[in-house]
A protein has these predicted regions:
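Short acidic-hydrophobic, aromatic-tinged amphipathic segments that line or gate anion-handling sites
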Residues: 111-115
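Phosphate-binding/switch loop-helix module in NTP-utilizing enzymes
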Residues: 1-35, 42
Length: 115
């Protein structure tokens, strides 16, 4: 259960947008996670489609190809602006560079790494 209402979340985002040139919103749990009832994180993001650019952050680990491609496909079908993909290096076994290049070729999105 969320500790906030959708109205409170909208108010917080609008306040942050009014005070800043750039607002970073970290989403944990996936795009289809419900916020209230059947209203998902994706639905909420779509409210800001004209004002936003999405940066996908994914753990750089084996098997990420399908997860990243599904996320990109869902965002594109929702007419959202995707800026780039960031792969976060961790302790997991990393995916091969060829797979990351394949994702780039399919999605036409640039990528970078962070630790």
């Amino acid at each position: 259960k969320n500790d906030f209402s959708l109205v409170e979340l909208r108010n917080k985002v609008e306040k942050a947008i009014s005070k800043n040139d750039c607002v970073f919103i970290r989403i944990i749990g996936g795009l289809l996670l419900p916020l209230e009832g059947y209203y998902s994180i994706l639905d909420f993001i779509c409210e800001y489609r004209k004002k936003s650019e999405i940066v996908i952050v994914a753990k750089n680990k084996k098997g990420l190809l399908n997860q990243v491609l599904l996320t990109v496909d869902l965002l594109k079908k929702s007419d959202l602006n995707i800026g780039k993909i960031i792969y976060k290096n961790g302790n997991d076994e990393k995916e091969h560079e060829e797979v990351l290049e394949e994702i780039k070729d399919i999605t036409h999105l640039e990528y970078e790494f962070i630790n």
